[in-house]
Amino acid sequence: MYRGKRVKLEDETEGSWKSFAAVRMTAVDDISDSTEVVEMEDVPSQFFVEKHSWDGLRDIIHNSRMYSGMVINKAPHDFQFVQKHDESGPHSHRLYYLGMPYGSRENSLLYSEIPKKIRKEALLVLSWKQMLDHFQATPHHGVYSREEELLRERKRLGVFGITSYDYHAQSGLFLFQASNSLFYCRDGGHNGFIQAAPMKPMEIKTQCSGIRMDPKISPGDPSFIAFINNNDLWVTNIETAEERRLTFCHKGLNNVKEDPKSAGVATFVIQEEFDRFTGYWWSPAATEDADGGKTLQLLYEEVDESEVEIIHVPSPALEERKADVYRYPRTGSKNPQISLKLAEIRTDQQGKMISAQNKELVLPFTTLFPGVEYIARAGWTKDGKFAWAVLLDRSQQKLQLVLLPPALFIPVSVDDPQWEEHVEAMPEGVQPFIIYEEITDIWINVHDIFYPFIQTSNDKISFLWVNESQTGFCHLYRITSLLKPGCHQWSREYSPSEDDFKCSTEEEVALTSGEWEVLARHGSKIWVNEETKLVYFQGTKDTPLEHHLYVVSYESPGEIVRLTKPGFSHSCSVSQNFDMFISHYSNVSTPPCVHVYKLTGADSDPLHKEPEFWASMMEATGCRPDYIPPEIFSFPASSGFRLYGMLYKPHNLKPGKKHPTILFVYGGPQVQLVNNSYKGVKYLRLNTLASLGYAVVVIDGRGSCQRGLKFEGALKNKMGQVEIEDQVEGLQFVAEKYKFIDLSRVAIHGWSYGGFLSLMGLIHRPNIFKVAIAGAPVTVWMAYDTGYTERYMDVPENNQQGYEAGSVALHVDKLPNEPNRLLILHGFLDENVHFFHTNFLVSQLIRAGKPYQLQIYPNERHSIRCPESGEHYEIMLLYFLQQHL
């Protein structure tokens, strides 16, 4: 078939994709103007997706969801190895975990026995055993409290039932939240292991009204647990049922404006943008008193949000409460005032609480640490000698790792004479120590890796840490800092400079190096064997597309040994005595499986112990019949970086046909979409699109993670200005390589940052993107939160041009005038990217006379949770695409 390519085209109009598609115009009419010069070329014909009715699309979605419901969230996770010391018994470990047993719809606490010996010729699949007897963990009718609902949003939890647990190894105590209450049970520890029947968990009774959140066991005395109730810290003794409120910050008022304080609770920004979900930390040590009693300590964050803006989210769906009200600090506005405090509990010989006392820092937090805006992480050293905290300035370009001796906290004083009396009682030489500092001109990605060793002398401390700003890639270091005490005369007038507490570094040894990353964010862990001087960690040394478990010596670093098999991406957990590890792994064509490996070899050479397959926890389920895995591709971009992408080929690919194409995009920091892991569950809809005849392309451009700080930092101060070019370059590469891509019919679709980029694509490259489908988009950066926006864009007064260029609502004049090219979707109750963003965008669209379609989900937040809403969204997506692409 021949199609005319006109040599002379009309002037391009920026708002029309048709100018780009003009080279694919219909066949030249036999009576076309003889004066027009026409060149003839062989152009493939277009493939058109079959149009289904709404009900037909619902059936398609039902079928795909039915399969995903069989496999989603089935894999066990949150593993805890417990070694068995019964020499005559058949099992070496009991493995505890959370999982969803066959036929169940909710997560439960389970265990498996790991045998000492196996038959190598047979596949051993460990049985999943219920720990809890006939226990419903999900609240009645699935209704969560507001606090639980919001925490589930921050943690992106989609599962029901038990979603986390705390465990105390010596006593075998398990503690968890379920059914709007707290429960505990025991297995292992001093009491031995249950042998057969599941146990009935014990409910922890309370005098509190409202939900109890964030329960934790005291490591120093497992009779005591702490929890949060109504934004204050409480403690209870599960043996005596004695309960006590430790802090009195919150008044329990319905009026948010008049009740701004909390204790032990991570604020919205800290949870959402820094991945810290707690605000208190038990000391691992319990001090024995002379009379046989104990002193227990908790470090906690106290927050005052008096000056933080209040946001109202009205909704008819809320019925009994006409509006939801939140504290939400928009970029450039006031953040909460923060401090660290200490709660101290004294008990008698019988464990009865004698007293509880709150202590504050000898000087205000802002005086000791001027310029600090965020407490990103906190905790205790293993011996309880120091509390520690990771502190960030507002620009998030300066990080300080600080040690705080408990003696630095004094009883809360009512007046100056009392304060002076408490200061007089302080031991000599007590001060904070800034043991490490990082400074960058890009931003600091907060991580979860800090391993302090027990001090061998009082004047120094050694620890393992990761640093990204030093080389541009996240790597492990062994650091020794000198704790040089100063001669500080504590007084109300004393105004320390930060140099007063800054420690010099005696030694900083890189354990890893190169253009790859040690995984350190989003709950990543390391496992340190102090006996063999080895550290086990996860990273991307082999390829940025796969996560593997590695081991290296921290005493004499050199060779880095990979323990997991290549060709897959792994998520691992190492046993507490370093003889086993468990891996949840998959690749693009193999669904996840979970296997246990034993490290075998000579004890004289622990670095080179070989992983031996030991048992299976879960085998890969078969792919659904119509699942075709995506192909991973890469190309050298004009930016100088190699970019990676995925392509889902249309299932009914016809030779010589051009298929409509969907660019699925996220494109923002801290996310990597393209990797060698199974996509058949979370991204099942992309396979569904391919099964209908669409080509689907996914590209990780500059700004995405695990490629180094320079790669991610390309967005610095210019969000929305670089990402689309990488996406377009990738599309053009794919179209050149795979001839079935129809560049005249490209849709761009994403959610959250991907929704923002979908709008940006239609604004800046309307000649490339025929339609955009934008879910929950940020449309004006001035309305997003401090922690995220300022990290990447600075404060508005320092980057006015960047804020204006990156705010899509200010550029609606560049959107096309043709109808059916823009669909916006948003949950009305979204407390992260508020519906204000879509509201403001739509107002601007109306003012500019631009066409659009809007789909609101009245009962949804930032993530669509309700199955009916999720189904409607997917049908809406398919219907819009088949009608308008």
Curated annotation (Swiss-Prot):
Gene: dpp9
Reactions mediated catalytically: Release of an N-terminal dipeptide, Xaa-Yaa-|-Zaa-, from a polypeptide, preferentially when Yaa is Pro, provided Zaa is neither Pro nor hydroxyproline
MF-aspect GO terms: aminopeptidase activity; dipeptidyl-peptidase activity; serine-type peptidase activity
SUPFAM superfamilies named in the record: alpha/beta-Hydrolases (SSF53474), DPP6 N-terminal domain-like (SSF82171)
Family: Belongs to the peptidase S9B family. DPPIV subfamily.
Organism: Danio rerio
Subcellular locations according to the entry: Nucleus
Biological process annotations from GO: proteolysis; regulation of inflammatory response
Disruption phenotype: Knockout animals display a marked reduction in body size and a significantly shorter life span.
Active site: S752 (charge relay system), D830 (charge relay system), H862 (charge relay system)
Self-association state and partner proteins as the record states: Homodimer. Forms a ternary complex with NLRP1, composed of a DPP9 homodimer, one full-length NLRP1 protein, and one cleaved C-terminus of NLRP1 (NACHT, LRR and PYD domains-containing protein 1, C-terminus).
Record-listed Val-boroPro binding positions: S752
GO annotation, cellular component aspect: nucleus
Enzyme class per UniProt: hydrolase
EC number(s) recorded for this UniProt protein: 3.4.14.5
Main function: Dipeptidyl peptidase that cleaves off N-terminal dipeptides from proteins having a Pro or Ala residue at position 2. Acts as a key inhibitor of the NLRP1 inflammasome.
InterPro entries, per the entry: AB_hydrolase_fold, Dpp_8/9_N, Peptidase_S9_cat, Peptidase_S9B_N, Serine_Prot_S9B/DPPIV
Alphabetical UniProt keywords: Aminopeptidase, Hydrolase, Nucleus, Protease, Serine protease
Protein name as catalogued: Dipeptidyl peptidase 9
